[in-house]
């Protein structure tokens, strides 16, 4: 799944849409983390960042230079239809397409299938595919919202998200952004995606997430 030639050409993104399908606490957290990091890097570098556009609320003529689709691997036909309706509005616009996939299952087969469907949908609409991040953490990752971004629990996902931030800031694919930034382009997978896993063994990870989730609920 290689990035298209246009996806490897840097482009200044003035506007960008962030879409989560379905609307879930986990996907909203991942998009929040991405947007927060984009804003932080812009402040540090003294540059501007793409203005968010709400395609669900704005009129049909709202134009965007890029889109980030956040989905989970329980990606069914209903979710695909919703994605296609959004992508139809961007058809032939040269908008950069990025994705975040939350892998809920233990293996990545379902996530790979979701990626393939999204990639083909972008290809059919002549939208440059610019890769993204697969978060292999199971469910309830939103429980990490108040954990330090570069602490033990969030660090692997933050580092993966930072690569996506770099790509969006350059307006190109993650792989090409790594090359332009002097990083290791080979750190991603063969399909250009960056896959992030917890730094802790699965049993410990799930126990911590369950504990954090319970504590968050008790504080509501």
Mark where each language-model region is.
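Active-site/pore-lining binding-face segments in mid-to-C-terminal subdomains
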Residues: 110-174
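A short beta-strand-loop structural module common to alpha/beta enzyme folds
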Residues: 41-60
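Hydrophobic beta-strand segments of well-ordered beta-sheets in folded domains
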Residues: 9-20, 50, 65-68, 94-100, ...
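Short, charged N-terminal beta->alpha structural module
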Residues: 12-47
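C-terminal and late-domain segments of enzyme folds
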Residues: 156-220
């Amino acid at each position: 799944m290689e990035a298209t030639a246009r996806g490897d050409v840097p482009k200044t993104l003035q506007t960008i849409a962030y879409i989560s399908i379905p609307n879930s606490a986990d996907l909203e957290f991942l998009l929040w983390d991405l947007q927060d990091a984009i804003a932080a890097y812009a402040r540090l570098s003294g540059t501007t960042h793409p203005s968010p556009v709400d395609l669900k609320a704005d009129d049909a003529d709202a134009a965007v230079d890029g889109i980030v689709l956040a989905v989970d691997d329980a990606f069914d036909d209903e979710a695909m239809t919703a994605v296609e309706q959004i992508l139809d509005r961007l058809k032939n616009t040269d908008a950069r397409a990025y994705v975040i996939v939350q892998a809920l299952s233990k293996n990545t087969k379902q996530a790979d299938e979701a990626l393939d469907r999204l990639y083909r949908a972008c290809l059919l609409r002549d939208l440059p595919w610019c890769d993204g991040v697969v978060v292999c953490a199971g469910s309830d990752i939103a429980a990490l919202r108040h954990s330090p971004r570069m602490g033990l629990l969030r660090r692997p996902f933050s580092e993966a998200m930072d690569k996506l931030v770099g790509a969006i800031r350059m307006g190109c694919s993650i792989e090409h952004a790594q090359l332009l930034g002097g990083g290791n382009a080979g750190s991603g997978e063969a399909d250009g995606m960056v896959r992030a896993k917890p730094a802790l063994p699965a049993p410990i990870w799930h126990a911590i997430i369950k504990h954090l989730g319970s504590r968050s609920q008790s504080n509501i």
